């Protein structure tokens, strides 16, 4: 374990040896209590509610600069992490703020249905609905509709990859760039790093429990859709260019590298950085550490380049 990450990593492993459905629910309550006190500085936060097909409401947070630029900027769909089973958009406010302060972009972040409430495809459907809403409201949000980005970390990174595959196949909305940060991609857990991993924050036992909840009756089935587990994808063509980073002692290390390398083999620009001795979510738990600061510096550099160079027009509406 990297010396800069060791102390908090050791404490985290002691506090939560593994996540179960019970601990997912418990920590989700804590997260929601803490974030209710969060008041973002230097950015504006709004809330909209979208009508789901089942007549329930999807809560979506919109984050934007307090003083918008005159010109239009990229629009980002940000998907929070939490093993598909916990969390909310507000937990990532500091990362979201970094993107906004970088170039004045607008970030749309759905409070998607957690797997403790409904299994796949509920979360995917929510995130896709939010992406379509971002496309349809680009003008109102001062967003370039040819620069829609999708990003997220952990389970949010997995959903980022899922949404980009789903959008490619549905052909209803174009995504210009994706950032699936240390993503949760493979339900099969067949890679070396995903097996017998007792790393801090997220380990093999937690991973198994989360996938069971997320997939429900699909768990351990051979025909799990690629939209649920993107590592099962075979056709990587026409996916958006991508960037990610990942630690090499966490469960998602191998599946992240494999996914990015397969994109590169398909001719998709895909850059990634591996951090030696870094565990899952190190950039959040040890945000002040040298590896974390470096990871976010490189992340923002890639985001800046994408903002300057990557565009993809929306398909004509039928």
Q: Which positions does each model-derived feature cover?
A:
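An N-terminal hydrophobic leader/cap segment in hydrolases
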Residues: 2-49
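Alpha/beta-hydrolase superfamily serine-hydrolase fold, recognizing
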Residues: 11, 15, 44-318
């Amino acid at each position: 374990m990297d010396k800069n990450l060791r102390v908090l990593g050791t404490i985290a492993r002691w506090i939560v040896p593994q996540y179960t459905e019970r601990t997912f629910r418990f920590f989700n309550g804590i997260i929601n209590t803490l974030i209710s006190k969060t008041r973002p500085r230097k950015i504006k936060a709004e809330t909209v509610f979208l009508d789901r097909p089942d007549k329930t409401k999807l809560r979506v947070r919109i984050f934007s600069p307090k003083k918008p630029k005159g010109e239009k900027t990229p629009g980002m769909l940000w998907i929070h992490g939490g093993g598909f089973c916990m969390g909310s958009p507000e937990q990532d406010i500091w990362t979201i703020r970094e993107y906004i302060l970088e170039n004045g972009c607008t970030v749309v972040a759905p409070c998607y249905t957690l797997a403790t409430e409904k299994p796949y495809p509920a979360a995917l459907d929510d995130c896709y609905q939010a992406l379509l809403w971002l496309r349809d409201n680009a003008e109102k949000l001062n967003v370039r509709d040819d620069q829609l980005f999708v990003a997220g970390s952990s389970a949010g990174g997995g959903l980022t990859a899922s949404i980009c595959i789903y959008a490619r196949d549905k052909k209803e909305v174009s995504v210009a760039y994706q950032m699936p940060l240390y993503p949760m991609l493979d339900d099969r857990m067949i890679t070396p790093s995903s097996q017998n991993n007792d790393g801090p924050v997220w380990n093999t036992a937690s991973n198994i429990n989360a996938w069971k909840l997320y997939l429900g009756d699909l768990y351990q089935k051979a025909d799990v859709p690629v939209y649920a587990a993107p590592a099962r994808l075979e056709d990587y063509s026409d996916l958006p260019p991508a960037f990610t980073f990942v630690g090499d002692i966490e469960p998602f290390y191998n599946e992240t590298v494999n996914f990015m390398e397969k994109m590169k083999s398909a001719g998709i620009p895909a850059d990634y950085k591996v951090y030696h001795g870094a565990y899952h979510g190190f950039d959040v738990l040890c945000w002040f550490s040298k590896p974390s600061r470096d990871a976010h510096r490189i992340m923002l550099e890639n985001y800046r380049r994408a903002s300057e160079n990557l565009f993809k027009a929306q398909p004509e509406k039928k």
